[in-house]
């Protein structure tokens, strides 16, 4: 049973999402509707994109805590370009390139300069946030064109154009990681760095690619954020990095690298977002969201740690079972007495 749970974390995450959707339905039948699903998905798109990028980094046994700042910085660039008169396609391409460049810089610090990922990205977290505030002067960016907001308007089956793009990206990345040698290189790099090098995997390049794509996903999340609310506050992206990491852990992405699936991270992001809608239904103040999400994450981490320890004990027991000789059987004393009498 323990091995099944460990090997099928996506199934357990899916069950948690389904239960969190069904149980509130007993309190309000209107909650069980397609409209609720589309609403939750629309709210979850930013976190899903960030979780997809964080998955690539975590698979290589690294972590990036600067994605919130990258999201904010890229959203600010998008707003500035649009207000300066540039077209939406040009502004979006420039925004994605900035995110790619920011992620590439993180990757260079980690892979080439050998700076621990948590230290490097803590530094760039402040750097990118500072650039964002320098560009805006601490002010909000408003007056964005209506065509930007159309990106998040319902297009087909209640899902926006960006929503469908997110679905396509999830499917493509799931296929890439599961079915291609390039995708498996991320797992190999995080599972055994030296072993991956001996197999010919360019581990430094893989880690740089992981950070670069993570930055690109953060930039896309910034575009989604701006299109959904129509303006850009000076604190855009604050705290999103922790939610992205939490979504990955909830979905079964190992902090030790080398295991997990993109679908699990998406389900984790959906679960964290769905908590908001349940709190609204239960009329619980919104500031409870972080507390409940943190409590759930802590419970998952404790459970994951205990599960890993139990599996390791079981594997050791199976490994050394053939070396353990059974204790010698003790013959009954009565049989010995009968032989002496004979």
From Swiss-Prot:
**Known InterPro entries for this protein?**
ABC_transp_permease
Cytoplasmic-side stretches of the chain, per the record, are 35-38, 91-92, 136-156, 234-251, 305-342
Per the entry, induction is: In the absence of AI-2, repressed by LsrR. Induced by AI-2, via release of the LsrR repressor. In the absence of glucose, induced by cAMP-CRP by direct binding to the upstream region of the lsr promoter.
Matches recorded under CDD domains: TM_PBP1_transp_AraH_like
Q: Name one GO biological process term.
A: quorum sensing
Transmembrane listed as a keyword? yes
* The keyword Transmembrane helix belongs to this UniProt entry's keyword annotation: yes
What topology in the membrane does the UniProt record assign? Multi-pass membrane protein
Of the GO CC terms on this record, one is: ATP-binding cassette (ABC) transporter complex, substrate-binding subunit-containing
Q: Which GO terms describe its molecular function?
A: transmembrane transporter activity
Where does the UniProt annotation locate this protein?
Cell inner membrane
Coiled-coil annotated residue ranges, if any: none
Keyword line: Cell inner membrane, Cell membrane, Membrane, Transmembrane, Transmembrane helix, Transport
**Which residues are listed as membrane-spanning?**
14-34, 39-59, 70-90, 93-113, 115-135, 157-177, 213-233, 252-272, 284-304
Topological domains on the Periplasmic side lie at: 1-13, 60-69, 114, 178-212, 273-283
* Subunit structure, as described in the record: The complex is composed of two ATP-binding proteins (LsrA), two transmembrane proteins (LsrC and LsrD) and a solute-binding protein (LsrB).
User: What protein family does this chain belong to?
Assistant: Belongs to the binding-protein-dependent transport system permease family. AraH/RbsC subfamily.
Q: What is its biological role?
A: Part of the ABC transporter complex LsrABCD involved in autoinducer 2 (AI-2) import. Probably responsible for the translocation of the substrate across the membrane.
Protein's name according to its UniProt entry? Autoinducer 2 import system permease protein LsrC
**Naturally occurring in which organism (per UniProt):** Escherichia coli (strain K12)
Q: Which gene encodes it?
A: lsrC
């Amino acid at each position: 049973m323990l091995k099944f749970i460990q090997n099928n974390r996506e199934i357990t995450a899916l069950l948690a999402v389904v239960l969190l959707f069904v149980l509130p339905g007993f309190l309000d039948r209107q909650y069980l509707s397609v409209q609720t699903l589309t609403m939750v998905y629309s709210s979850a798109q930013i976190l899903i994109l960030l979780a997809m990028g964080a998955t690539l980094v975590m698979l290589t046994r690294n972590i990036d805590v600067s994605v919130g700042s990258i999201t904010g910085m890229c959203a600010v660039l998008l707003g500035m370009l649009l207000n300066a008169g540039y077209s939406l396609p040009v502004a979006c391409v420039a925004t994605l390139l900035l995110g790619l460049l920011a992620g590439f810089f993180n990757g260079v610090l980690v892979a080439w300069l050998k700076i621990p990922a948590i230290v490097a990205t803590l530094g760039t977290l402040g750097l990118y946030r500072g650039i964002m505030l320098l560009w805006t002067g601490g002010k909000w960016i408003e007056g964005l064109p209506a065509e930007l907001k159309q990106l998040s308007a319902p297009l087909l089956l209640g899902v926006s154009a960006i929503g469908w793009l997110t679905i396509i990206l999830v499917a493509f990345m799931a296929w890439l990681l599961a079915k291609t040698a390039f995708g498996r290189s991320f797992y190999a790099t995080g599972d055994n760095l030296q072993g991956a090098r001996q197999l010919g995997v360019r581990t430094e390049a893989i880690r740089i690619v992981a950070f670069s794509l993570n930055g690109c996903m953060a930039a896309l999340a910034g575009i989604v954020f701006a299109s959904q609310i129509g303006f850009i506050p000076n604190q855009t992206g604050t705290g999103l990095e922790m939610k992205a990491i939490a979504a990955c852990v909830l979905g079964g992405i190992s902090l030790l690298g080398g295991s997990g699936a993109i679908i699990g991270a998406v389900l984790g992001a959906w679960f964290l977002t769905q908590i908001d809608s349940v709190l609204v239904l239960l009329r619980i103040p919104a500031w409870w969201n972080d507390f409940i999400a943190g409590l759930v994450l802590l419970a998952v981490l404790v459970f994951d740690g205990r599960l890993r320890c139990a599996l390791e004990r079981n594997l050791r027991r199976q490994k050394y079972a053939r070396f353990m000789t059974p204790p010698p059987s003790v013959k009954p004393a009565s049989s010995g007495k009968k032989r002496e009498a004979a």
